[in-house]
């Protein structure tokens, strides 16, 4: 039927209580009262944006994986564009830039090719910050 996780009923309900509490605490503000925009690069499913929306920011995400973008759009107020970012990608005006560039080019678990790795997103991230300043 499914994979057995080895949780007792008490463990399961403790996790569910915690999950419910966190979801309530991080519920995005519908009115986005701060009138400030956050651009989330390499947004994934929107974990960083979730915190900013909970604080009242408007968010705009950019993510190349369709499944992650769909999750972002399903759970957050802001939009998420599905596209592969480039150094010259245009972004909307924003007061804050956040994101999670891929770590594989620098991770000790990989080949550490750095700037030679095609997945290196740091130049894109830095370019966005410079242009949005």
Segments the model singles out, each with a brief description of its role:
Residues 1-133:
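Conserved active-site and SAM-binding loop architecture
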């Amino acid at each position: 039927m499914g994979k057995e996780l080895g949780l007792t009923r008490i463990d399961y309900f403790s996790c569910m209580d915690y999950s419910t509490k966190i979801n309530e605490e991080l519920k995005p503000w519908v009115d986005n009262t701060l009138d400030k925009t956050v651009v989330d690069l390499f947004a994934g499913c929107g974990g960083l944006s979730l915190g900013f929306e909970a604080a009242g920011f408007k968010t705009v995400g950019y993510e190349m994986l369709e499944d992650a973008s769909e999750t972002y759009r399903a759970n957050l107020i802001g939009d998420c564009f599905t596209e592969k970012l480039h150094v010259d990608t245009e972004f909307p005006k924003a007061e804050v830039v956040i994101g999670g560039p891929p770590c594989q080019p620098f991770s000790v678990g990989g080949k550490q090719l750095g700037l030679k790795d095609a997945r290196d997103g740091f130049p894109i991230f830095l370019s966005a910050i410079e242009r949005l300043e």
